[in-house]
């Protein structure tokens, strides 16, 4: 199996659940978007996936997207899966989609081309149950971007915990955003979890805020023994 991997909570938790089910993950597949506006792929601090790959002790294959075109994103994903299929003889792709039929259909069409299975461990999972499970399973998750009404600079750089999850739930009810952030309302990076052999520590970062949305730009991370 290969796992579409962005380093955020969804792809990492899907990887975790796949391994819990006894699936062997041979490689991580990471696409580097041309723009933060990508409909298919996560972009903030995507370079850190190489360190997360080391923490997981799973090899990573990357490919860079050169435009904002959906067709270009699709073609670059096709190239990535073709490479994984050739090099690792994969039989399936794990992805972290929860409710996006658009995303799932795009991924599924490529899987059908290579006759491999699309595995979606989070599909249709209740948002609160999912977010709570992340904490129950000792995932250390930092919020690295916000871009929705109700989410301000207070959340940028914070580590998800039970207290701020309750606050996020109330705000999601009030402002109507997805608690799981699947619509891009916020982005995350996983710093530690049970399948990491090492944990990540952020050494340097900077917050940017334009009045409506913001990002934590991480410039230095290192790996620590657990």
Task: Please give the residue ranges for each predicted region.
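Nucleotide-activated chemistry modules centered on ATP-dependent adenylation/adenylyltransferase
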Residues: 1-226
């Amino acid at each position: 199996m290969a796992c579409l991997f962005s380093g955020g909570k969804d792809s990492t938790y899907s990887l975790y659940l796949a391994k819990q089910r006894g699936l062997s993950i041979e490689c991580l597949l990471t696409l580097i978007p041309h723009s933060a506006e990508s409909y298919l792929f996560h972009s903030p601090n995507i370079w850190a996936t190489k360190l997360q790959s080391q923490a997981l002790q799973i090899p990573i294959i990357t490919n860079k997207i050169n435009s904002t075109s959906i067709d270009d994103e699709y073609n670059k994903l096709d190239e990535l899966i073709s490479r994984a299929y050739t090099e690792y003889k994969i039989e399936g792709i794990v992805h972290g989609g929860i409710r996006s039929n658009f995303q799932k259909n795009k991924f599924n069409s490529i899987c059908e081309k290579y006759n491999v299975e699309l595995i979606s461990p989070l599909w249709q999972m209740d948002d609160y149950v999912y977010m709570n499970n992340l904490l129950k399973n000792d995932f250390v998750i930092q919020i690295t971007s916000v871009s929705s009404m109700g989410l301000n600079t207070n959340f940028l750089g914070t580590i998800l915990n039970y207290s701020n999850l309750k606050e996020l739930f109330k705000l999601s009810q009030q402002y109507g955003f997805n608690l799981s952030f699947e619509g891009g309302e916020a982005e995350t990076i996983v710093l530690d979890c049970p399948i990491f052999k090492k944990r990540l520590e952020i050494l340097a970062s900077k917050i940017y805020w334009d009045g409506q949305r913001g990002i934590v730009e991480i410039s230095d991370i290192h790996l620590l023994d657990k």
